[in-house]
Curated annotation (Swiss-Prot):
This is Putative late blight resistance protein homolog R1B-14. GO terms for cellular component: cytoplasm; membrane. It comes from Solanum demissum. This protein is encoded by the haplotype B genome of the allohexaploid Solanum demissum. CDD domains: RX-CC_like. Residues 521-823 form the NB-ARC domain. The gene is R1B-14. GO terms for molecular function: ADP binding; ATP binding; metal ion binding. It is a peripheral membrane protein. Keywords: ATP-binding, Coiled coil, Cytoplasm, Hypersensitive response, Leucine-rich repeat, Membrane, Nucleotide-binding, Plant defense, Repeat.
Length: 1317
């Protein structure tokens, strides 16, 4: 308590010492005794202790300490020390512990503990015989000057905290072998602890209300101190000690402790009456107020049960909702609240003064005894309870909302009233009125989105925000009613107030519309006035001299390894510049291996190694099982004999570079490393030969060119007046590329008029020079309200994280950020939102689909990400809970609605009880899997009862699916089980279900219960290798899932299985599945897929080769077939049913018909992309009129193919051919096609890419033991070898690499020497 730092330091030293291995329990017990003595001896330093008749332990302990010093010769107290507290601190806590710590565990080190315990035990025996409860000093006694500190409420509260902490350990120890184990009545000890906490709250409450305490308050503080010390003394005297058996606290002693508390309630009443005359002081928190209305069950009388139950219910609600309620939300009710709390306290403690308490006490007797009317006195409490409960909920709502929340509420209100009609019966009329009101407001919310530049934008958005806040309140009221967490009178009143407030909002909107009708203008673009900014590729603008300088360093210079360090402030374009060089064809062709990783401020060393290995030798899921040392060694050996180019982006400190530098060997072969960092020190530290490059700012010409390109695309600014303003704006951006790009995003959304641009220039002002955050803030300010939540949500992602767009959009929809629009899919609307953010240069595109150009992945610049995190926290929208976070959960209320992002499971455990109303839990950690058997993850999640999004990113393994969270709309996690419980249908709001198997259960088929088909709101189902548990039940009893759009990966064992699921999902758009059919019809069966299906990926299972059905999907655009046996007839019959196919990928296929594929005239009329990978195809015959719209042809690993058909020379739409790991004749035919396309057809957009790789395949039908497989793995370090892939089903080994003839010969000779060939 008073030297906690010393005790904590001792504990750490003990636990780190060898003694902890042998005597852990004795160490804890030893420290426990020291804590108690700390309390007693410090207290008895003050004169008031003897006046109160408190038992004096100091003299007795002083004699013991001195005797102990004589026994342990190594202990030497300071001269003249004659104080027990000083001895405890100096001699026992330092010198005795040092003696024990310096003793070897195998020596007789137990003597120190045993001797100490024996001395204390004998002392306790003497004290127990004499101890009695101390008396309270007379009020007339003068306070000793030396005791002035002991009367401060802070001292009293610290003392009580120390005693409570000591008591709590007794309750928590459940191991019977522990020296601190108490086998007796722990419930009574726990109750005493609660009583002490109440006393502390009372002390805190009194001190908060009185800045200058009166003498009566000082007496009360002393009274509280005596009671706490009495409890501590009784418990200490009966504490179990080593060697003397377990001595628990006697029940009679516990009863006396409680009776002592109750008999002194008159003191509480006197203080409360005195406080009635004080003026309440404004507090930042209401913790003391919430504590003062705490009402343990034994505080209320058995009689008058109905009245007492109502009172207790209201006081509990008041307590729960007062905690951390901001004072600003109750500043006008502060005096009323104080009065209610004081009256409640007087009411509770007055009950103890009624003599002859009996169960048959009646209300009139109670009122006469108390001197007031109990029902009438309860009424103000009721009013305050409602007010506090409402304010506590409202003040924690996020200030940025998704406009789709009303859609979600309206759907749920119908479901709730159907499922919980009995619970909601008394609210039925109010809920119907609310539904009608919200439905009438839907057109207004649609206008807010479709006309974001309306002159009344601010008023519109304010009204929209109020509407969404009312929707949150309705949801909470309905849930509180169903779960009975608030009284009916409170909820009914709340709904009536909501109806009244919605009426006021509608009146404001109506008034606004009347004004708007007379001034219907739009200050910026409309759809007919403004052409959207053209989409451009990420071509770099400026830095031409820098690029040439860096390119020269990469290709020339020293023969040894060199690190090219680029450093500069955020927003200069370091990453863009480095990526430009990394993807430069003239640079890439100079190196054997290219690999990259992004470090960031927080990183996982293992993930960095895996990323580099993936680029260097190809992806291999088995690598994740290896530890960091093995991965680092693998990377080093891979790079050892190659000339490599490594891009290490965003390094924050020297230690991160130290982690990686050992993996990059210097073979004196001109290998290069590009490193980007914000810090000059890091760049200088990493440099080897070349000096670090400090990236300069843009010059004025570059600044304008970048602004012009981002606003006008490939066109130029034709207006000189507009250009003058643009030049001024570019100059105001401080020559910082990021700032220029952000401002360009603002300008691109406006009319290209001088007046509009002048307005932007004026708003930017001069203060934004070199201040990118100011420009980000401006870009955020002009965002329409429906985009603000989408943008701030990026703050939930990690730094430099590449974000999958499909996942992002599903999260947005589940968070209700997307407002529905009749006739449009939510996913399409969300894509429009994303494109808007991209058009404003707030989001960077990292990958687009080849076929339609849609965004597949994106990321945020670090500056923008930091802004999102900070602004989201300010708006109570998103909170990051980090391991090193200074603030604790106590800062935030349990009424918190914000989305929470966690980085550690321990954080989730700690916060779970404090965030019952949180809507989203997002787990972010750079490591792979996290699973702790010490606690049940799913049980912890049940505390988040309003959870709508649970995204654990497949990193947290849950022990079971939390099926009680019926608000849940998005669930993503990993599981170890091989079946899903039928109770999953309780998640009736679930729209996205993503479950991933852990490495342990990855190869098992997961059984899906038939109840999954009752989840009619399901839109996306992603479970690895699942099959229906009961097909018959599925067919007969289940409904169709009309909303289900994507499924992966069902396991079809028969054509009938496939037909069954396809009939149940009529609106399916994407299907990824495995197929196994041991029996199939002799003639191809036509399988009719859903008419809306656009993407289909079919994989074969181990036991099957031929596809037993033709695919009929009239609107299919993307088809991938992998691992099957095919022939020309099958492809011809299938293509007849796929008239709209745009992308075809054929992978790992065996071709029949003499390994020949014939493509007839008119086949694949809409095909744009054709990818052929690892086919056994030898001869490819294509008619002249086939593939009329083909744009891309990619051949990977087609080593047996003789040539690309010459008809590809005449396909005018062809833009790109890529050849990888194919023979020379294929390369030659590709070059012939290039020559014809470019020279004869004048197709300047045509591009040919030839990747010079070689693939060697070896059969391992015999002698494929583990040792021989290891021999193949050892081929990787050889020159030119990139990867070795095993297919144990086919009993083949594939060796891939950039190998010439000599290198291939080296591989073969190595295998021959090992006896493998």
């Amino acid at each position: 308590m008073y030297f906690n730092n010393e005790l904590s330091g001792l504990k750490d030293r003990f636990l780190k010492s060898l003694l902890a291995q042998k005597y852990p329990d004795r160490i804890n017990f030893f420290l426990w005794e020291l804590k108690f003595l700390d309390c007693f001896l410090h207290l008895q330093n003050f004169a008031f202790a003897s006046e109160c008749g408190m038992l004096d332990v100091s003299q007795k302990m002083l004699k013991n300490f001195k005797r102990m010093c004589a026994t342990f010769r190594s202990i030497r107290p300071n001269a003249g020390s004659d104080n027990a507290f000083a001895y405890l601190k100096e001699v026992i806590c330092k010198r005795l512990c040092a003696t024990l710590l310096n003793t070897r565990p195998d020596a007789c080190s137990d003597d120190g503990f045993a001797y100490w315990n024996e001395v204390i035990w004998k002392t306790k025996q003497e004290f127990r015989a004499k101890y009695s409860f101390p008396k309270t000093p007379l009020a007339s006694n003068k306070v000793d000057d030396d005791d002035i500190n002991i009367h401060s409420p802070k001292f009293v509260m610290e003392f009580i905290d120390a005693v409570v902490g000591n008591l709590n350990v007794l309750v928590k120890i459940n191991d019977p072998c522990s020296l601190l184990f108490v086998p007796g009545p722990k419930e009574q000890i726990d109750q005493v602890s609660k009583e002490l906490k109440l006393l502390r709250f009372f002390v805190c409450f009194v001190s908060n209300k009185c800045i200058e305490p009166q003498y009566g308050h000082t007496t009360f503080y002393i009274h509280a101190l005596i009671e706490a010390s009495h409890i501590a003394m009784v418990v200490w005297l009966h504490l179990p000690v080593y060697g003397n058996g377990n001595q628990d606290l006697a029940p009679s002693e516990v009863s006396r402790l409680l009776s002592d508390f109750i008999s002194r309630n008159s003191n509480y009443i006197d203080v409360l009456k005195a406080l009635k005359s004080t003026i309440p002081q404004a507090q930042n928190k209401h913790a003391a107020e919430s504590g003062i209305v705490e009402t343990p069950t034994h505080n209320l009388m058995v009689g008058l049960s109905d009245q007492m139950v109502n009172l207790q219910e209201m006081l509990c609600l008041l307590r729960d909702n007062l905690i951390h309620l901001p004072i600003l939300d109750l500043e006008f009710h502060l005096q009323d609240m104080d009065s209610v709390i004081l009256d409640a306290g007087l009411l509770i403690y007055s009950l103890y003064d009624i003599e002859g308490e009996k169960e048959d006490t009646v209300l009139d007797d109670m009122n006469r005894a108390l001197g007031f009317d109990l029902p009438r006195n309860i009424e103000p409490i009721k009013v305050m309870v409602y007010l506090v409960m409402q304010k506590a909920f409202q003040c924690n709502l996020p200030r940025v909302h998704g406009l789709g929340y009303v859609d979600f509420l309206l759907k749920n209100l119908n479901d709730f009233q159907g499922r919980y009609s009995d619970s909601l019966a008394f609210l039925k009329n109010q809920l119907q009125v609310i539904q009608t009101e919200f439905e009438s407001l839907q057109p207004f919310l649609k206008v807010v989105i479709e006309e974001p530049h309306n002159k009344l934008k601010t008023l519109n958005e304010d009204c929209a925000t109020q509407i969404i806040r009312k929707a949150y309140e309705v949801e909470y009221v309905v849930d509180a009613c169903i779960n009975k967490v608030a009284p009916h009178w409170c909820l009914e009143r709340w709904l009536l107030d909501i109806i009244e407030e919605i009426t006021c909002i509608k009146a404001k909107i109506q008034e606004k519309n009347t004004v708007e009708d007379t001034m219907k203008t739009v200050i910026t673009h409309t759809s007919s006035q403004l052409a959207r900014t053209p989409r451009m590729n990420e071509e770099i603008v400026g830095f031409k001299d820098v690029i040439e300088n860096l390119r020269n360093r990469l290709l020339n210079g020293t023969k040894g390894q060199d690190v090219i360090s680029i450093h500069g402030m955020p927003g200069l374009g370091k990453t863009t510049l480095a990526n430009r060089l990394y993807s430069d064809r003239s640079v890439v062709s100079h190196f054997d291996i290219c690999a990259q990783c992004c470090v960031s401020q927080v990183y996982s060393y293992k993930e960095l190694l895996l990323a580099l290995l993936c680029d260097a030798v190809g992806d291999d899921s088995a690598r994740r099982k290896h530890n960091e040392n093995k991965l680092a060694d693998k990377l080093r050996k891979t790079l050892l004999s190659r000339r490599y180019l490594i891009l290490v982006d965003d390094v924050w400190d020297n230690s991160a570079w130290d982690d990686l530098r050992g993996c990059f060997p210097d073979a004196n072969n001109r290998s290069r490393i590009i490193l980007t960092t914000r810090h000059h020190e890091v760049a200088k530290y990493a440099s080897v030969h070349s000096d670090p490059l400090h990236l300069r700012m843009f010059d004025e010409d570059e600044s304008w060119k970048l602004l012009e390109k981002k606003v006008f695309g490939e066109k130029r600014c034709s207006s000189l007046l507009l250009k003058d303003v643009g030049l001024r704006i570019a100059k105001m951006c401080g020559q910082l590329p990021l700032s220029i790009v952000l401002v360009a995003g603002i300008l691109s959304e406006m009319e290209k008029e001088v007046e509009c641009w002048e307005q932007v220039a004026n708003n930017l002002g001069t203060h934004i020079h070199n201040d990118s955050r100011a420009i980000v803030n401006q870009s955020y300010h002009v965002l329409p309200c429906h985009l603000k939540s989408c943008f701030l949500y990026f703050g939930a992602f990690l730094e430099d994280e590449v974000i999958d767009i499909s996942r992002l959009i599903r999260l947005w929809i589940s968070e209700s950020f997307i407002k529905s629009s009749e006739g449009r899919r939510l996913e399409d609307i969300a894509e429009g939102y994303l494109e808007n953010l991209i058009g404003r240069n707030l989001v960077m595109v990292t990958q687009r689909a080849d076929s339609d150009g849609k965004v597949k992945a994106c990321r945020l610049h670090d500056v923008l990400l930091d802004f999102c995190k900070e602004r989201a926290a300010e708006e109570n929208f998103l909170l990051w809970i980090n391991r090193d976070q200074i603030s604790t959960k106590a800062v935030y209320s349990h009424k918190q609605h914000a989305h929470l992002a966690f980085t550690e499971m321990d954080n989730l455990v700690e916060w779970s009880a404090s965030c019952s109303l949180v809507g989203s839990v997002l787990f972010k950690n750079p490591d792979s899997y996290l699973y702790s058997p010490a606690f049940s993850t799913s049980l912890i999640l049940l505390n988040f009862k309003f959870l709508k999004v649970l995204d654990l990113e497949h990193q947290v393994v849950i022990d079971f699916i939390p099926t009680e969270l019926f608000y849940l709309r998005y669930l993503s996690a990993s599981i170890e089980q091989n079946s899903i419980p039928s109770s999953i249908s309780n998640l009736w709001n679930l729209e996205t279900l993503i479950l991933k198997s852990t490495p342990v259960g990855r190869h098992n088929t997961l059984l899906l219960p038939s109840t999954i088909w009752d989840m009619v709101k399901l839109r996306h189902l992603h479970i690895p290798k699942f099959s229906p548990e009961n097909e018959e039940a599925l067919l007969e009893n289940s409904a169709r899932l009309y909303d289900l759009e994507t499924i992966s990966t069902p396991y079809f064992s028969s054509v009938e299985d496939a037909e069954l699921i396809l009939r149940k999902t009529p609106n399916l758009r994407k299907l990824i599945c495995e197929v196994e059919c041991l029996e199939y019809p002799p003639q191809y069966h036509v399988l009719n897929f859903p008419i809306r299906l656009e993407i289909l990926k079919l994989y074969r299972s181990k036991a099957f080769k031929t596809i037993p059905f033709c695919i009929s999907a009239p609107n299919l655009k993307y088809l991938k077939l992998s691992g099957f046996y095919l022939d020309s007839q099958y492809l011809s019959e299938t293509v007849d049913h796929l008239k709209h196919l745009e992308v075809l990928k054929l992978c790992d296929l065996e071709f029949g018909d003499h390994r020949e594929w014939k493509v007839s005239n008119g086949m694949f009329p809409q095909l744009k992309i054709l990818k052929l990978e690892y086919l056994s195809l030898m001869k490819w015959i294509v008619a002249d009129d086939a593939f009329p719209n083909l744009e891309q042809l990619v051949l990977h690993g087609c080593q047996d193919l003789m040539e690309i058909p010459s008809c590809f020379m005449d396909i005018l739409s062809l833009k790109y051919i890529e050849v990888d790991m194919s023979n020379k004749s294929v390369v030659k035919s590709a070059k012939n096609i290039e020559e014809t396309q470019v020279e004869d057809n004048q197709n300047t957009n045509f591009k040919l890419v030839i990747i010079k790789k070689m693939v060697l395949k070896f059969d391992i039908y015999q002698n494929h033991d583990k040792g021989r497989l290891e021999t193949f793995k050892k081929l990787v370090p050889l020159p030119g070898v990139k990867s070795v892939r095993f297919d144990m089903d086919e009993k083949k080994v594939t060796v891939t690499g950039v190998m010439d003839a000599n290198e291939v010969q080296l591989v073969v000779s190595k295998l021959r020497k090992r006896g493998m060939l």
